[in-house]
């Protein structure tokens, strides 16, 4: 089932894939990594001025990694703002997705966390480095094929 935004993207020749609607009726779209930044700018100009959240997950062991963006269109006098969910999939071998930091500044720490936990590199992010794990940490803890080390060095907090 194609939603209103999916139909609008088709009308304007913007490549995407409709993933239908979630349990709350929010339209979900899949965008290719190479198209994501330009389509993000279009959504911002169209009125999706608030990035509510960004997260990432490992689709399947040895499979793709996904970066998920929840956008909201906030307008004065509107009781129920429009929401949109975007999924961008990246290969496990070289997971690269354009950062949307320059579109929505609120994605700063969220893209860093996705990098830290899953190893997705967000191109043109101004401070892409680990945020939860030490810089010396090897591997990506939330990947399904991650093997946890047997030994954790406890560092002095002082």
UniProtKB/Swiss-Prot annotation:
Pfam families: Complex1_30kDa. Keywords: Chloroplast, Membrane, NAD, NADP, Plastid, Plastoquinone, Quinone, Thylakoid, Translocase, Transport. The keyword NADP applies. One of its GO terms (biological process) is photosynthesis, light reaction. It comes from the Eukaryota. SUPFAM superfamilies: Nqo5-like. It catalyses: a plastoquinone + NADH + (n+1) H(+)(in) = a plastoquinol + NAD(+) + n H(+)(out); a plastoquinone + NADPH + (n+1) H(+)(in) = a plastoquinol + NADP(+) + n H(+)(out). It is an enzyme of class 7 (translocase). It is a peripheral membrane protein. Its EC number is 7.1.1.-. Belongs to the complex I 30 kDa subunit family. NDH is composed of at least 16 different subunits, 5 of which are encoded in the nucleus. This is NAD(P)H-quinone oxidoreductase subunit J, chloroplastic. It comes from Solanum lycopersicum.
């Amino acid at each position: 089932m194609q939603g209103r935004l999916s139909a609008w993207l088709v009308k304007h020749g913007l490549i995407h894939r409709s993933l239908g609607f979630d349990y709350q009726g929010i339209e979900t779209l899949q965008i290719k990594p190479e198209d994501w930044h330009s389509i993000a700018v279009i959504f911002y100009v169209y009125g999706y001025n608030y990035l509510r959240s960004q997260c990432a997950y490992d689709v399947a062991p040895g499979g793709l990694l996904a970066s998920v963006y929840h956008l909201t269109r906030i307008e004065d006098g509107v009781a129920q703002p429009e929401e949109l969910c975007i999924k961008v999939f990246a290969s496990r071998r070289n997971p690269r997705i354009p950062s949307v930091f320059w579109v929505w500044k609120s994605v700063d720490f969220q893209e860093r966390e996705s990098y830290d936990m899953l190893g997705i590199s967000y191109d043109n992010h101004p401070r892409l480095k680990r945020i939860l794990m030490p810089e010396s940490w090897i591997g990506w803890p939330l990947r399904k094929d991650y093997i946890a080390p047997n030994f954790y060095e406890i560092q002095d907090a002082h």
